[in-house]
Amino acid sequence: MKIYQKVLLFIATIFTLGTVSKEVHANEFNFSVNPVLPENQIGESGYFNLQMSPGQSQTLTITLKNTTDKTVVVEEEIASATTNINGVVEYSPNKIKTDSTLKYNLVDYASIPKEVSLLPNSSQQVKVSVTMPKENFNGVIAGGITFKEKDSEKTNSNSKGLSIQNKYAYVVALLMQQNKNTVAPDLKLNSVEPSQVNYRNVINANLQNPKAGYLNQMYVQAEVKGLSNSKLSYKANKEMLQMAPNSNFDYPVSIGDGNKLEAGKYRLSMTVYGQKNNDGKFTYVDSKGKEQKFDYQWKFTKDFTILGKTASKLNSKDVTVKKTPWYENWLIWLGLLLILLALFFLFFILWKRRKKEEEEQDLEKEKLKAQLEEMREQISREDNSDEIDV
């Protein structure tokens, strides 16, 4: 299969904890990585792009060199290729879930030692065992091999006292295929739902590449319009995206900093172009006003609903949305008023009941008093009658 992707020999990846990024330089590494390309390598490239027969097993070699005067321990890990939220293919381990269409995960067909110790100023060859699935298939199994110095986190501090930990790693792409047959690309829209990116409200459109081939040079036009409120409209256009084989990612449509999500019905309209070709039949005008030709085009329309409780929850977590003080929230005041009214009616009912009980008690006392008075009069009459008889 023809791969249109240009993969660097080494993808120096920086994982930054915080909001400050830093360019990776060669001197950040205490070791170097050099893949030894085998005879069944496809094309002239600095990464593994192998053509293998069904069921074939093979051992690959990668040379690691320690360029320091101390022992360096290198951690090694294999991962399947995924697509991140920026529309960039990831070859290193991450938290992105594998797609439901991924039949052949590179992790199941390649293995490498977990770590290797490099003596000072020495080189060592690392062996990678790979096996092609026995079944015949068209397409590519894609992923990467990550090399990272153990305990290599470096902490930098800025003038405000913010500590930032940087992790540096070499990533060598590893592609395996049985033939060079072209796999026609496809694209699907799965779901559309509100979410957040970096604590900011967005509407995510999940795009899926269900084929075992790269989807290259993607240009995306997306617009979300309010159906319940026609004044609401959000757009997000991006260019030169790429998707890994059998992967999906959330394409975010920002609603803008400071804007609250509104509950209601919405409609997403999206057009995606793929694979540039001067003879392509689909035309797109890019951000510079230049016409671009593409071989493929996909159009999607999907209606969705944002619930009130979902909007409230996301708005409360959006760091750019101004929070309404509690004393300005009419719902809180209404709630307090209802509570006061409920308490008033409760006290009123209890007071009426107590008053009624007291009146009944007074009436009983009056009746008892009258009965006692009547008994006294009767006794008095009987006494007088006895005196007369005598």
Residue ranges and their predicted role:
Residues P54-T61, S123-V126, N138-G144, Y199-I203:
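Short, solvent-exposed loop/turn segments enriched in Ser/Thr/Gly
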Residues K65-K70, A81-T83, E135, Q208-Y214:
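Short solvent-exposed strand-capping/beta-turn motif centered on an Asx-Ser/Thr pair
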Residues K2-A26, I332-W351:
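Sec-dependent N-terminal signal peptides of Gram-positive bacterial secreted proteins and lipoproteins
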Residues F29-S57, P194:
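N-terminal edge beta-strand
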Residues V72-N94, T131-N179, K260-K317:
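Terminal connector regions
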Residues K355-V390:
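Cytoplasmic C-terminal tails of single-pass
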Residues K180-K188, V192-N329:
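Membrane-proximal extracellular "stem/stalk" segments
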Residues K97-N136, L227-L261:
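Intrinsically disordered, low-complexity Pro/Gly/Ser/Thr-rich segments with frequent PxxP/GP/PP motifs
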